[in-house]
Amino acid sequence: MIFYFSGTGNSQWAAKTLALQTQDELYSIAKIIKTDCTFQLKKGEQVGFVFPVHGWRVPRIVRVFLQKLKLTDEEVQPLKHHCFCLMTAGDTIAQAMERFQQHLHETPIGRMLELDLVGSVIMPESYVGLPGMDVDTKEKELEKKQAAEIYLRDFGKKIIQKQKEDDYKPCGWKELTVGPLPWFFSVPVGGFFERFLITDKPFHVDSQRCVKCGICANVCPVADIKGGLGYEPEWLHNKKCLTCFACYHHCPHHAIEYGKRTVKKGQYFYNRYKVKENI
């Protein structure tokens, strides 16, 4: 089974692509986190996690899900199940994978899973919350998607073959796109992101452009937007916002802004013609 979280569709596409190769069942973390999150593993069944990097860290919703997830085994004396993790990012992931490994080990399911395959795939940029950060050009977007397709074909083969390395690190660790200064970006910068930049407070709507279609409320993965068809969006400020920018990117009239930081910036989500799937 593969558990995934996605805001603008990159990780959803990656998870679906892998599931087609591996024949694994897909579960949206944003949907199942509202349940008791209990699943039974079959003999030899593997578990995968696919999600984007947020501020060079694991998204809060994924961390909460790991704590809530309960896995049972049909075997009386079960062996550890194979586990893989794939992260999507616009550029680098820094120490996000190390942090995921730590989060996993700190949960009850960590005793049942053996993280033996990891990967990071570069996808079109969607973070627009800081000056100088914008979506990619159409040419760059296409280039990244084509490279990602090739990467996922190879990663899917490794999942099926249950590849391992003799080293103490999971297979694929050395190829992760950690970038320069990984500790700096994941620890002090990532901490700054979580404390000050992951918030819904700057979001606002331009009433002259808003057509009250309700798309923004529908695509919010944490139900942080009050509204719907016939209503302007109202952010709840309940500290659940992930700042994934799904609401901003999916607005068909570019009526949503994030303070002044998104003025004249572009929009992006993976599949522009199937809005309802990108949650």
Language-model features and meaning:
Residues L181-V222:
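Acidic, Ser/Thr-rich low-complexity intrinsically disordered segments
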Residues V205, V211, I215-L236, K240-L242, ...:
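Iron-sulfur cluster-binding cysteine motifs and their immediate structural context
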